[in-house]
Amino acid sequence: MKILVIDNVNYEDYPTGGILNFYRNMLPAFGSDLLLAGITTDDRTPVGIWTHREIDGQEFEYFSMAKVTPSAKRPLIPERITNCFYIKKYIRRILTHNDFDWIVTHKPEVMYFIPDGFMSKTCYIMPGVENPLSISRYPWARKLAGVYDRFFLMPKAAKARKLLAAADLNDRKAFAERSKGKISVDKVIEFPTRYDDSIYGVKRISHDDNEKIFVTVGRLGWFKGWKLMIDALKQTREKVNNARLYFIGDGEDYDKIKDYVHEQGLDDSVNLLGKMAPKEIAVWLNKADVFVMGSMAEGWSTTLVEACACGVPCVVTDFSSAREMVADGKNGFVVSGRDERDFSHKMVEALGLNRDKVIEYDKKFERLAVSHLREDMEKILN
């Protein structure tokens, strides 16, 4: 089976996030059976033609749609809009390489420009089923969420051969309802995020007993709930005075977070560690006493899956799939609402969970290892 992947990533390290992680997992799983169309962040890869590119020691046929300069800052023009320009420009040229059985993408703007004649071999994978404009970094864009659903997303998604979603049943039902009859819930197949089991797993790492380590991983954006986690840490330190919160990741809110931490008098208790390689993240997850996530919305969170793979207790907000992964009192807690006192209470309670029992419970998620990815995708696509 040959798969053409089209997305605005470079399949190596930019932009960071769950979508890139998914493709990173696809590379070793499918190898040379993948054709890659994406972006480039280097000066070596030509734009606008099919060529060959080496990624992690493996050579792939590659089509770069744009040369992009990496930045953690919010661009003046939303990436979804700039994506549309170069996807529209090159989509037909990409499709001239017709040696593929399936087209796979996570991006609705890619799917929108795929000609209808190719939709019968298109698989659209949704990292979450919420309307992406509803959680946009741009306030004006959130006002267009309804228009986006009605005229942009749903009509095209209804034509896709396969719809996969990293979301639980309730959210998949909500997505089907939003389609106004265009898409049935049965067509939206649950497909959880995967973790790289060659990197993420249980490793006993000792740390200073005088410190209780809370770790969160993800983009530094408002929708990831950084304020909730910082406020909750401040509450937690009233009971656990050696509690510290470590942010792993980069993003447009870096300076805002630094300023807010200073305003709250938490300079010695909150650390922004920046972007890290997966192996470094795995070390921190194993070192952590508790993993925390304050997201306003998620699909099947990659970092939550990775945290469970490392056997660390998790305290998370009630986003899609949270209750699929976290069982209260077993391997962590799911917190309804966005009250920092409730979140803090569960952070403290999670410190008391038996780590060995958490590790034993989390073994049930070994089925989400990337070593099963190809087999699981082929069952759906064949």
Predicted regions: what they are:
Residues 3, 102-104, 115-136, 164:
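Active-site proximal beta-strand in glycosyltransferases
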Residues 92, 144-165:
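Membrane-proximal helix-turn-helix segments that form the acceptor-binding/catalytic region
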Residues 258-276:
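Nucleotide-activated donor-binding/catalytic signature segment of Leloir-type glycosyltransferases, i.e.
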Residues 275-276, 283-288:
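Short alpha-helical donor nucleotide-sugar binding micro-motif in glycosyltransferases
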Residues 296:
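Aromatic "clamp/platform" in nucleotide-sugar-dependent glycosyltransferases that forms part
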Residues 328-329, 333-340, 348-354:
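Conserved acidic donor-binding segment of nucleotide-sugar-dependent glycosyltransferases
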